[in-house]
Amino acid sequence: MFLYSKLLNRGKTMEKEKDIKYVPNIETRLRHNILKMPDCIRKSSGIVIYGRRIKSIVFTTDLAIIRNCDADAVFAVYPFTPQQVISDAIIKASYIPVFCGVGGGTTKGLRTVAIAKDVESQGAMGVVLNAPISDLNLTAVALGVDIPVIITVAKEDTDIQARLDAGATIINVACGQDTPRVVKKIRDDFPNIPIIASGGKTEESILETIEAGANAITYTPPSTQELFKEMMSKYRE
């Protein structure tokens, strides 16, 4: 009986090994130092947009990082008023889809609609609106473009239903250390809406956010300064 059990377990192990497919990894002599997103993000379900599954989203406007990372998409959101010349440069330089910030805080009203239409024509996969934007302004943007509209949620007491009614396609949860709890609350109330969330820096926090119900994770990579510091340390050895 013991021998039979041992053989059975061995057979199951061999079956699992057969299921693991070899994935060719192509690099070149110079372009091999790719910034990798945390592997644990792959455990998320992802969000399928225009047939493309998005799981990992790099949160940066640094073109050097965008061109040298393995993320599924880019979150091009920055703490200044959106400028079309910036979005155009990022979209043109990126291998991967770009979600562009179009305002919501400092930038409001008709300007957000105009910028949203501009980035759509430039090739953005979606637009991102910041938490302070009004429902009326959100509706104007949603009616003005034919790409997903992502609304950022920064507080637990946000009226999610009102945001959805106003035209939001995807919810982006950015509540700091409370993100997993807020994601879970939203997921419990809205089982089927797409949720993007910031996962933090550690594998534990990312997995906690995914388990709470996030479909995709935004990840803030190390800065070029930090990466250069690490490289120079190796050069000094």
Name these PLM-found stretches.
Residues 7-100, 104-110, 121:
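Conserved N-terminal beta1-alpha1 strand-loop-helix module at the mouth
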Residues 15-33, 45, 52, 196, ...:
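Alpha/beta catalytic cores of nucleotide-metabolism and tRNA/nucleoside-modifying enzymes
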